[in-house]
Structures are given as structure tokens and as C-alpha cells.
């Protein structure tokens, strides 16, 4: 047991450095090509001329597509093993390392150029790759899946500063591919990754800064639960739209570079209306949580961002949809809160409360992982007072969503690439 805890610690350290490496590579490329050192793609887009804002995501998608197609032609074969940590956990615990690194580099290109796709997916993949590489050298074959799971959880903890949610992500989303008894090493890896990540970044701040002064009362619990019902209905709709957009892009029968370029061009066109569509949505989420906008502003940004996410994910841009889903959930919750705020004197607090609820419940509705989703929002914002209400709402959202749409976003992703 001591040996496993020691290896889990090493995996956590490796994962933290993998995540930090990807993050610093992003910052470097943003500085080189976008003349932006703020770390915010929305700020970068705001400071660009309209024609650069239009073309940059398309050029990034084109470059990523050429890289992926060029690698496949160079090797003259498709990857001989999984390039995704979920697939690796469901098979024999092995990666095609070279193809996975090329995929991560392609993700770096599309993320840095403004596509509305999550950077955290590539971060978690790199963390799992580092764990797998270490495991294949120093551990028996039957443990390889465990250490990939530890690496993925640690990567998630370092990316989102949420070690418990990262651990439960493995238990809930990938349930059946590993035993719950193995959660000990997973949690150790996640916590170590967070601590090392804090040391690297010289900060232990929460991912999102929120000033929620409301004390949750009976009325608020009713609103939280009703938001869970709304998210349970919206989750399957979002998954269906993502699937439909992917099918439409495939039906165009474009070469991968042009398909990714088209997705980027759509994002560029939408960014002419609002630069908030650029990136994974982190900056926009923080601005909404700091000062919730008016109803029509939320609605406008929500629609543009939704189309940008659908275009990016539908075109096959390598990256995650975890953080974009958080923004969509926040916007849905805030739209609901703004509508209700017309009848309540504390409309601002209700909007903020239901925005946080929307983040958790839409995440639960798309991942079918209510406990992880609840802990994720609490850990990212520090608002643990919301935990009881969020847990109930997330369970309701997950049950409704699972009834209407059998597959979660991750099972849908795996089926699409199998």
C-alpha cells in the first residue's frame, strides 16, 4: 500500500508539471502571435482588428488540421492505440504516445487561436500520458489503468483546482472501468497535483472569485431545485445539438484542415459581434460572476457562445467541452435568475445564485455525474454553503437528463471516435 501511495505522489507531481507546461506554452503562443500577455483570449480578441479577429481562429484550425493530416500521412496509418485517456481506461491501458502528443499540439494551436473549445482536455490528456509513461516503466501491467486514472484525476485537479471533484470524476464518469477501492491513490495524486500546481503558479487562489452574500433559505432551495429541472431538460438538448453539428460537418466531406478551418471561421464571424466567444469561456464566466450583466446582454453573449462551441466541437477541434459547458450552464442559470429577479427585491443575488446552480446542474446533466458536478462548483468558487441544495439539484438534473438522453457527453464522445 505504501508503494502505491508513493507512486500516486509521483504521478501527481508529473501531472502538475504537464498541466503547467501546456499552460505556459499557451501563454507563449498568445504573446508571440496575438501580442497578448494577459492570459485572457477575450482580451486578446478585443484588442485585435476585425479582420484578424475573423481569420485567426480559422488559421489556427487550418494549422491544426494540417498537423493531424500530415502526421497520419507520415506514419501511413491511424493511431495503433488510444489517444484519449477514457479510451485507454476502457481498453488495455496503453496509449499511442506519439499520436497523443501530436493531438495535444493540435489542441494547443486551436485553443491559442481562439476556438471555443476547452484547453483543459489537452491538459488532462498530457497528465494521463505522463502517468502512463511512468507506469509502463516502473509498475506491473495490471496497474496501468489505475495510474492513468490517477494521472487524469491529477490533471483535472491541477487544471480546475478541484482535487475532490477530479477524483470523483474518475469514480462517476468512468464507473465500471476501475474499482472504488482504488480511489485512495487517485485522491493522493489529485491533492499532490494541486499543491505542486499552486507552488508553480505561486498562488493558491480559487479558480473563480465570487461574492455571494445570500444566506440560502427555503425559497432559495426551491429556486435551486427548479434550476436543476431546467438544466435536466437543457442538457440532452445541448448533447443533441453537438451530435447534429458534428454530423453536419462530416456530411460536408471536407479534408480535416478545411473542416477545422471552417469551424474556426464561424467562431471568427461570431467574434465580430462579441469577442467573448473566443476561448473556453473562463474569462467570460469570471466577468459574469463579478458583475452579472442585464438580461439581453446575457442572452446575446449566450447565443453567440453557444454557436461558437457547437462550431468548434462539431468541426472536430481537439480539446474539451468541460469549461464551455460551465459557461453555458452559467448563462442559462443567470437568464432564469434575471427573469425571476423581476419579482424579487434581491434580484442580483438570485441571478448570481442561480448562475452558480446552472453551472453545476448543466454539468451534471451532460456528464451524468451529480456528486462530481456539485463538488466541482464548490471547490472552484469556495461557496460550500450551496452544497446541500446543489447536490439535490444536480441529482435531479442528472436523472432527468439520463431519462431523456441515455449517453453522457463522454460516452457520446467515445462512441463517436470508436
Swiss-Prot record:
- Its recorded name reads Voltage-gated ClC-type chloride channel ClcB
Gene Ontology biological process terms in this record: response to acidic pH
Keyword set for this entry? Cell inner membrane, Cell membrane, Chloride, Chloride channel, Ion channel, Ion transport, Membrane, Transmembrane, Transmembrane helix, Transport, Voltage-gated channel
In which domain of life is the source organism classified?
Answer: Bacteria
Task: Give the taxonomic lineage as stored in the record.
Answer: Bacteria, Pseudomonadati, Pseudomonadota, Gammaproteobacteria, Enterobacterales
* Biological role stated in the UniProt entry: Probably acts as an electrical shunt for an outwardly-directed proton pump that is linked to amino acid decarboxylation, as part of the extreme acid resistance (XAR) response.
Q: Which InterPro entries match?
A: Cl-channel_core (IPR014743), Cl-channel_volt-gated_ClcB (IPR023790), ClC (IPR001807), ClC-type_chloride_channel (IPR050368)
Q: Recorded GO terms, molecular function?
A: voltage-gated chloride channel activity
Leader sequence residues? none
Encoding gene, per UniProt annotation: clcB
Q: Where in the cell is it found?
A: Cell inner membrane
Where are its TM segments located?
5-25, 54-74, 146-166, 168-188, 222-242, 258-278, 291-311, 316-336, 352-372, 380-400
Stated membrane topology is: Multi-pass membrane protein
Q: Does this entry carry the keyword rRNA processing?
A: no
**KW Cell membrane (keyword) present:** yes
Give Gene Ontology CC terms.
Answer: chloride channel complex; plasma membrane
What does the sequence similarity comment in the record state about its family? Belongs to the chloride channel (TC 2.A.49) family. ClcB subfamily.
Q: Which Pfam families match?
A: Voltage_CLC (PF00654)
Amino acid at each position: 500500500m505504501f508503494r502505491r501511495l508513493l507512486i500516486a505522489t509521483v504521478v501527481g507531481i508529473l501531472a502538475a508539471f504537464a498541466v503547467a507546461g501546456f499552460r505556459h506554452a499557451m501563454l507563449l503562443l498568445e504573446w508571440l502571435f496575438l501580442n497578448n500577455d494577459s492570459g485572457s483570449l477575450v482580451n486578446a480578441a478585443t484588442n485585435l482588428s476585425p479582420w484578424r479577429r475573423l481569420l485567426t481562429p480559422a488559421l489556427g484550425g487550418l494549422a491544426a488540421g494540417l498537423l493531424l493530416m500530415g502526421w497520419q500521412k507520415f506514419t501511413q496509418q491511424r493511431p495503433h492505440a488510444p489517444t484519449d485517456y477514457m479510451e485507454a481506461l476502457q481498453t488495455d491501458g496503453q496509449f499511442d504516445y506519439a499520436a497523443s502528443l501530436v493531438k495535444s499540439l493540435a489542441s494547443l494551436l486551436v485553443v491559442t487561436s481562439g476556438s471555443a473549445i476547452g484547453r483543459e482536455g489537452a491538459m488532462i490528456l498530457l497528465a494521463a500520458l505522463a502517468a502512463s509513461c511512468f507506469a509502463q516503466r516502473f509498475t506491473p501491467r495490471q496497474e496501468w489503468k489505475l495510474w492513468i486514472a490517477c494521472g487524469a484525476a491529477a490533471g483535472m485537479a491541477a487544471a480546475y483546482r478541484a482535487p475532490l471533484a477530479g477524483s470523483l470524476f474518475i469514480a462517476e464518469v468512468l464507473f465500471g472501468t476501475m474499482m472504488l477501492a482504488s480511489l485512495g491513490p487517485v485522491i493522493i495524486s489529485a491533492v499532490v497535483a494541486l499543491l505542486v500546481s499552486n507552488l508553480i503558479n505561486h498562488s493558491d487562489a480559487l479558480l473563480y472569485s465570487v461574492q455571494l452574500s445570500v444566506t440560502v433559505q427555503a425559497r432559495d432551495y426551491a429556486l435551486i431545485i427548479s434550476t436543476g429541472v431546467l438544466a435536466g431538460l437543457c442538457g440532452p438538448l445541448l448533447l443533441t445539438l453537438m451530435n447534429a453539428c458534428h454530423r453536419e460537418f462530416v456530411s460536408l466531406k471536407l479534408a480535416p484542415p478545411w473542416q477545422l478551418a471552417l469551424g474556426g471561421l464561424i467562431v471568427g464571424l461570431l467574434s465580430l459581434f462579441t469577442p467573448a466567444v473566443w476561448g473556453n469561456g473562463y474569462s467570460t464566466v469570471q466577468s459574469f460572476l463579478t458583475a452579472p450583466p442585464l438580461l439581453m446582454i446575457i442572452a446575446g453573449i449566450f447565443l453567440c457562445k453557444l454557436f461558437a462551441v457547437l462550431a468548434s466541437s462539431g468541426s472536430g477541434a481537439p480539446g474539451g467541452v468541460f469549461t464551455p459547458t460551465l459557461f453555458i450552464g452559467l448563462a442559462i442559470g443567470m437568464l432564469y435568475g434575471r427573469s425571476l429577479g423581476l419579482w424579487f427585491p434581491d434580484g442580483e443575488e438570485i441571478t448570481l445564485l442561480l448562475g452558480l446552480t446552472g453551472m453545476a446542474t448543466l454539468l451534471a446533466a451532460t456528464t451524468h455525474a451529480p456528486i462530481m458536478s456539485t463538488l466541482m462548483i464548490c471547490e472552484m468558487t469556495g461557496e460550500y454553503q450551496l452544497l446541500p441544495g446543489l447536490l439535490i439539484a444536480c441529482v435531479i438534473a442528472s436523472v432527468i437528463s439520463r431519462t431523456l438522453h441515455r449517453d453522457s457527453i463522454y460516452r457520446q464522445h467515445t462512441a463517436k471516435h470508436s
